[in-house]
Amino acid sequence: ELDTTFTEYTNRLRIERSKLYLQRSGMTLTEIACAVGFEDQSYFTRIFKRQVGVPPGKYRANNLTA
């Protein structure tokens, strides 16, 4: 997409990777935020909700796999 900034692109990739952590790990939101490249968990939560439509904790509760 030509209208996407570098930051938007990298955030999208980070959020996609964070979905896997949320589904398959017991890591905290802070640990996941750090693992995917966000320095601030609240910023991660804001970006996640903006892109996915729900906060990461709710996403995890709805999509947890064993």
Q: For the regions a protein language model found, what residue spans apply to each?
A:
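Terminal helix-turn-helix DNA-binding modules in bacterial transcription factors
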Residues: E1-E39, A61-A66
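The DNA-contacting recognition helix of HTH DNA-binding domains
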Residues: D40-S42, R46
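…primarily DNA-binding HTH/wHTH and HhH modules…
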Residues: R46-A66
